[in-house]
Amino acid sequence: LTTITSLIMTYSMPTLPYAKDALAPIISQETIDFHYGKHLQTYVNNLNALVSGTPFEGKTVEEIVAVAPDGAIFNNAGQVLNHTLYFLQFTPQPEQNQPAGKLAEAIQRDFGNFENFKDEMTQAATSLFGSGWAWLAMDKDGKLVIVKEPNGSNPIRQGMKPLLGFDVWEHAYYLDYQNRRTDHLANLWKIIDWKVVENRM
């Protein structure tokens, strides 16, 4: 019985679609080793241990984040989800430097143009006090919005779809940029895989 239960759902690390040094110098291999290899691995390990024997066992990370009460299970599930979306949205050689297709049309509709969106997203991430995330999300009506989430929270908690996330916890950038959060954010725009972001709509 124990073996069967353990097969229901275990949370695992996302496979990076690039080599650990491929995003350098924007995100160094050292940062990937710590941020992905240690921080995210810890959240994954914690979540697997915490949900065992609870009503959340066997639920997807998205399901947990949507309904779990504030506390350790929610915090770790949120960070597993956030970091999975984060690491999978990058590519060392983007085919395009801004969105195309339906994502581009939605940005045009809801922000006026790409530069306005970029400025608003950067401002949200820059101005978030302490640790947290800035997200481009799609609300229940299909409108694109920028959401600031504290700590490990995610727009799923508000019934939205997360499309693009910027991590402003210091562990995301301190090895490469020290206290220069703004420089880090400016560089992230150069490695976004817009096709991945669009496919999340």
What are the residue ranges of the model-derived segments?
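Short, Lys/Arg-enriched N-terminal segments with co-localized hydrophobic residues
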Residues: 1-8
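Feature for soluble, non-membrane regions of globular proteins
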Residues: 8-201
